[in-house]
Amino acid sequence: GRLGKLLVEEVKRRLPQAQIYALGTNSIATATMLKAGADFGATGENPVVRGVMDADAVLGPVGIVVAHSILGEVTPAMAEAVGGCRARKFLIPVNSCGVVVSGVKEQPLPNYVAQAVEQMMQELGEA
């Protein structure tokens, strides 16, 4: 919930015209992102699998591309859909997902979020 909230707030702050689809692995995460300003929200495997097909960018924890991560909430179908979608993926190295990204200096979560959104804007030509 917290990471999604921070991502939605930062994207809306930097790109107020952006349409944000909050695709949560659980209803609390989805509700938190909607409350933070996401335009649409849905929860579970099928919304994630279907939702990433049309996305320009996907932002989230690194665990969204690892099956069974985030306490088992990421299904193999979700991980495959996110990893294989055409969208550019901007992933936050959150070690609680069970994945350690070597060489990444530990930073406060808001710093990672700001960097991910900045990189997304540059790569998608929004900066």
Role assignments for model-derived ranges:
Residues R2-G60, I64-A127:
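A cross-family phosphate/adenosyl-ligand binding-site feature
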